[in-house]
Amino acid sequence: LPDELEGMPEYSPLVFPMMDYVIGHNIDFDADCCQIPGAVKRICTLAMARAIWPNTSHTQSALLYMLSNDRAATRERLRNAHSAGADVIFCYEILLAILSERPHIRTIEELYAFSEECRIPKVMTFGKFSGMPVQHVETGWRNWYRRQTDKDPYLLRAFELYPYDPMYKE
């Protein structure tokens, strides 16, 4: 609210040092909010977690509980779950668990490639085709989506990789 801003210091945008990669849980949200330049490669722990552990909730809290050996201690740690510092630590712990599941990933570029692969949906997450394989999304709907102004580039890539196939079986 405007009255809460009275007497506060002037806003100045964040300035990030030169970086090649940024890692986060739902990284596009963080990168867009922080105005991280588009040339920086985004690595998404949310997308990788969805690929590695498809049958669980993928919030940071749910993943930390799933990965935990001490739920009481995890519950205590999660009391600070909505601070930036805690989010960074939790994201790091999830990243370590992802890397333990994928020991062949040895470099940041391999991690980025895996993240990019995981970000391409295989199942629709919204609309009338929600929950269905991308191959079941009809051509007309695909064409409609391509005409929208706010398109997900990863869904467009999925349309390229997985053409419409009404006979497709999982």
Report the location of each language-model feature.
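Acidic two-metal-ion nuclease catalytic site recognized across multiple nuclease folds
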Residues: I94-E170
